[in-house]
């Protein structure tokens, strides 16, 4: 993710400093981006050069909360923190305690996809969401994510699957009356391997979801209004079906930025730099969401 942010910042011609921990990762970053990295970790950089006014935190998931906390302790006023912000509610609450008046946003970049923006426009035109469904099966077939630490694998629903859940509830509303079930287990994810649930959101929409990490499948979201069905499968694309027909048409999108950069990251980063992003997931919102994710995951 750090490379994705660097590509956007370079295109926006924004000055920035890159801070990393180890020589190997720093060398790989420099080789890929041409940008020098200050090694030694964020604490060392803060002591030597002082706090920045803004910070983007794109470290490994198990280091997110500690890194954000170190920045907030020195008075950084605004932080864009990679999703999910931490490995659970406890870590997010600790960030909240250290944030004070600082603004912390959780970087769920799918809120900024061109497909999502067009869906928001079309849904509003239709009069709002009546119901929605989403699939959170990991693909390909929930292969063990060996590239991350075991502690992250054990919380993979938060670290990875929460991306699609956030998108679904962002469009359809927050769950207020709902129930869920989970069962099974994987060797690397003991919490559960199968997930299902349904309920009602604060917008009045009904919803349901399902995921089976031991079966074929992939992420998808389907949003229903009184006149259309909007389908994200894959999430970067949008299809629409009208009432009275079972045919679906691909919606034309102005997705040049999503194709030139990591999808959603350009618009998300630009909105963060400008301030006051109405689409961002605030820290307080994520703390509430995390309780939902942990219940869904069976943690």
Region spans (language model):
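N-terminal Rossmann-like dinucleotide-binding module
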Residues: 1-34, 48
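C-terminal helix-rich "cap/oligomerization" subdomain common to oxidoreductases
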Residues: 18-19, 31-32, 51-59, 69-70, ...
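Active-site loop of classical SDR/Rossmann-like NAD(P)-dependent oxidoreductases
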Residues: 24-25, 232, 256-270, 281
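A contiguous active-site-proximal alpha/beta segment in oxidoreductase catalytic domains
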Residues: 46-49, 85-145
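Hydrophobic residues in well-ordered beta-strands that form the structural core
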Residues: 80-81, 104-106, 232
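Mid-domain beta-loop-alpha active-site segment that forms a flexible
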Residues: 107-114, 144-176
């Amino acid at each position: 993710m750090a490379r994705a942010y660097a590509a956007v910042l370079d295109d926006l011609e924004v000055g920035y400093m890159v801070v990393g921990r180890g020589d190997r990762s720093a060398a790989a970053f420099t080789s890929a981006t041409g940008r020098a990295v200050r090694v030694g970790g964020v604490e060392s950089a803060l002591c030597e050069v002082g706090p920045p006014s803004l910070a983007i935190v794109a470290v490994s998931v198990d280091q997110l909360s500690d890194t954000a906390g170190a920045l907030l302790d020195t008075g950084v006023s605004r932080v864009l923190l990679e999703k999910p912000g931490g490995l659970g509610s406890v870590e997010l609450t600790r960030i909240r305690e250290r944030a004070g008046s600082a603004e912390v946003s959780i970087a769920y970049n799918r809120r900024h996809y061109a497909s999502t923006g067009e869906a928001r426009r079309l849904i509003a035109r239709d009069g709002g969401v009546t119901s929605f469904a989403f699939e959170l099966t990991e693909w390909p077939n929930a292969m063990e994510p060996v590239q991350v630490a075991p502690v992250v694998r054990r919380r993979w629903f938060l670290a990875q699957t929460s991306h699609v859940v956030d998108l679904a509830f962002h469009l359809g509303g927050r769950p207020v009356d709902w129930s869920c079930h989970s069962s099974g287990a994987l060797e690397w994810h003991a919490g559960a391997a199968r997930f299902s649930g349904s309920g009602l959101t604060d917008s009045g929409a009904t919803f349901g979801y399902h995921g089976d990490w031991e079966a074929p499948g992939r992420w998808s979201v389907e949003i229903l209004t009184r006149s259309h069905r909007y389908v994200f499968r894959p999430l970067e694309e949008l299809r629409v079906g009208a009432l009275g027909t079972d045919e679906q048409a691909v919606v034309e999108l102005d997705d040049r930025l999503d194709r030139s950069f990591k999808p959603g990251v350009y618009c998300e980063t630009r909105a963060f730099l400008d301030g006051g992003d109405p689409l961002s997931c605030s820290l307080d919102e994520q703390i509430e969401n995390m309780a939902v994710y942990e219940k869904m995951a069976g943690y």
